[in-house]
Amino acid sequence: MGVGEKELQSKKIGSSRIRHNLDQGDLKTVNDLLGYRYQTTGTVMHGEARGRTLGFPTANVSHDAQYWLPGIGVYVTRVKVNGKWYQAMTSIGRNVTFGEGRPVTVEAYLLDFKQAIYGEIVTVEWDYRLRGEIKFDSVAGLIQQLNQDAQDTKAYFEAHPITKLALEWINC
């Protein structure tokens, strides 16, 4: 049976419905429809290093056209680096605080992670949308929001713990 032939809550499960929910950032529905957490894979590239100067060094992850990204916003994610999963908050956006007309980037801030991983292929597992993209009037306002996002990300993981058995399985 193909994906388009299945149903969830009396509605057809098809790629159009999944893409629509991805565009909306509705990862709960996407993950329910798929039966697993949505993932994308990309290579960590050098960026502008602005996150590091703000106290939030990010992995700038390339995004291939084969993957449909969730809508613009900030998300609770897990990022797999060298076979190990890390809790993260990930932004998909144009960094509008720093100018207009910028390209869409995927930037993951891995919690409790200090390694340089340029050139590494990573997998991003998308769990929950925290908020949309905001244009801040000041860098101080952005940093304040990033601190709140980090707290919200940690709170999400505390409220949705992964069991030891599941953690061992996903780290295989």
What are the residue ranges of the model-derived segments?
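Contiguous mid-protein beta-loop-alpha structural module that forms a pocket-lining wall or clamp
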Residues: 1-33
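Phosphate/ribose-recognition catalytic cores of enzymes acting on nucleotide-derived substrates
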Residues: 3, 46-172
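Short, well-structured alpha-helical segments that form the helix of a local strand-helix-strand
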Residues: 29-35, 142, 146
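Acidic/polar loop patches that form or flank catalytic/metal-binding clefts of enzymes
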Residues: 31, 41, 87
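Residue-level detector of secondary-structure transition/capping positions
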Residues: 37-38, 150
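Short amphipathic
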Residues: 39-47
